[in-house]
């Protein structure tokens, strides 16, 4: 037995002993009136957490001195005041329970895991009402009576009070019993023989009923657990209510509300049924729903007994006769009254069970007895007889009408009940959902033997219940009972307003299902283990929504969907799965499908019932495509599958056993495995390259570069560029053809710009044609030569050349004359830079009018040519354009304007003059007037190379004699090598230490032109290097492995550097002084041959780049090449 169950049993035992001690200490009571006797009976008045009692009119009678007797009768006895009062106002009083003390922890269903016979012996005959059906097969009537008599012998002299009361209460008409089916006076052992005979007669009738109906133990057990003034709650609901009652804090409110509802309901039922058994009929509705077949069998037996012994029937309210009469009288009563009456009574039951099940007979013991009966029913449920015993009562339109009428009559007293009931439903939701979360995979152990019974139970309780609460009573399904009780202890009480509107009819309440959404809210909270603040916020939202549960003008489902739209996506998964199972089970019974399904605001937890009750792994089925069900549910819906819900597609197969397991992982390892699988990344094979073959890498790079340049593709690109330039030439020519006079732009800056564009396009087209011809003539042979060279030697890296601060000096005489002559011609200059066909740029136009700075024209633009090799050649070409002013005076213009008449001679003259004027342009191969040649003329050129770096003034070639240019061009040229050779690693360096050679392991970093080394890698960021080796000072033609004759260490490379000699230099093992230079021999040893080769490749690349791009910055190599 687990510690939790043992603790519950200990607390129950302590409570019982405390009650016995308290009752023994009470003095012998004299005959008292019913209300006073009722007030005096408070065995648990000193228990912890007791709330203030209600007014005396609403207190419960409790005159029996023994807790054992209370337990024996606490579910079926009729309260003394009930039997005396016949008016409905008085009838209501006994049903209002005293504020039950909040017990620290009610007994959990786990405590009921014992066999059926064992608890009967444990609890003695006082619990025989719960276990009598099982024990009746092995005990006789005489044995039981003896046991009861012996049990009551240790009760003290207080019994006289009870005897007088019981003998006085027994003959009262049973019409008053309708108010509250409380305890019948069956077991008072006192000095008065009448009282004893009456009790024994009652007990005999009860036991006879058990023996006659022993085969239907499960149904009887379920109904024996009824509470006074309440309908017989199904086992799961009772357990759920008992477990959820831990955090209840509204006993008085609920107890107060319970009274008027039951009284009114029973009074209204009397005209339509036997007055003596109205309440008993209503109390049996849920039992008949759960197991109508066995109870009906018991009905015929007990009815025969009633005909034979009517006096005994009035005197004794045997629980089994009560149970048996209910289904028997159901046909006589229109079935609408039953569910409504049961709804009212179940509301009261929920309130009482939530608050420690405060019943008149035994307030502290009821939860344990109920759970014992529930466990017994669990065992009996597994048998086929139990499954076969489920029947569904038929519901007619008259039933619905009576239900609505009764509900309207009771709305005044049900307002507070609704609020309290909704609160209990919230707590049960949380308990069940967290029970699911805690239970995890443990459900799969009971899958084979209990899944079918669970399906039937859920189907009948959700699909076939007539009352609002019955739909909710399946929340605590049997596998969840113990977990529910455990979780309920830590569950925060959800406080709801007690002034909730409750004026809508049954059919109106079926249109809204806010609690379904509330279920998803609570489920999300339990699954995510939200913080208390988040729980309070969600509860506030629930409270706001629940205030309009029964408002007929608001579609609560739509409102809550808006509020909890994000919660629905997660919560609907399990509900949808369960809903499909409900549809399948419901389709098997055509009779049940014809019945109407009444859903009120009290029964909106049906989705929860489906989720929890059908959560076994067999229900994992593929959901159909997503669809939105209708928000409003018709009252005559034949299936429970019409609740409003958003179907969420779930990609799971029917045989996927792990679907629920994936949702509710039960261990950290399982969660981690699931998480890693879900976030599985593509497998990346990480390789730490310490033996990289740089030679092959460089070879591949060069081969790829040469191979990727397809000849045909290159030729196609050149042709496209040629066509593009041809288009530019044509457009520029058309623009220039329009410049015929000053009015049309002749001599303007626009004309000069058009000439510039024409010049650039023409020159570029010529370069592209030249490149195309080279490709056609040489083909791939020329590129193969370069690739062979690059493979045999280390190819230098590409670089970039930057030209800036370009200026073009002019002759001083020309500058002076231009300044004096304002009507002189305009001189435009243009510098064009050519570095092959693909890289050609031109400067903007510079004129003597606006770009003259001193005696030179300045070009502020900076040009950078990228990806040029070390043997680059940049051709600088200077072009000039002279725009002369119009020499015609104003008189000639006037005369020309006068002769406007066109004569044949003038027309011929104009044609011939135009032809002579544009004769130079007509020679274009594009046709007459198609294209033009630029009027820019070349006035100087120069070729720049790497050797030009460092100079700023270059002489121009081909300068005309009368040109205004001085003959030089000034610019600044700079080069940058795009070499990104870097390497890091450990090398062992040979050093001279006091004349002795020593190898020291260093962390070496090759960056730029230097090798810097430290002792440790971390020192690179914190300390200055121990030493540096400048590769620009290397005089070796190529870095090679050290000669083994001089250096025996393997994997060693030799690097010889020189530097100017210093005064303190002297010869060591690694350095020698020659003339004015100090030559140092550096031996660097790698760990492996591959690493040595890698370092050699990197160092050689750096040396090549230095020597080719910075020839003046390094020493020339010495020795053989």
From Swiss-Prot:
Record GO biological process: hematopoietic progenitor cell differentiation; mitotic cytokinesis; podocyte cell migration; positive regulation of bleb assembly
GO molecular function, one term: actin binding
Signal peptide (from-to): none
Compositional bias (Basic and acidic residues): 1-25, 147-157, 303-314, 368-384
Chief localization: nucleus
Sites bearing Phosphothreonine, chain numbering: 192, 316, 359, 392, 396
Protein's name in the database: Anillin
Organism: Mus musculus
Taxonomy of the source species: Eukaryota, Metazoa, Chordata, Craniata, Vertebrata
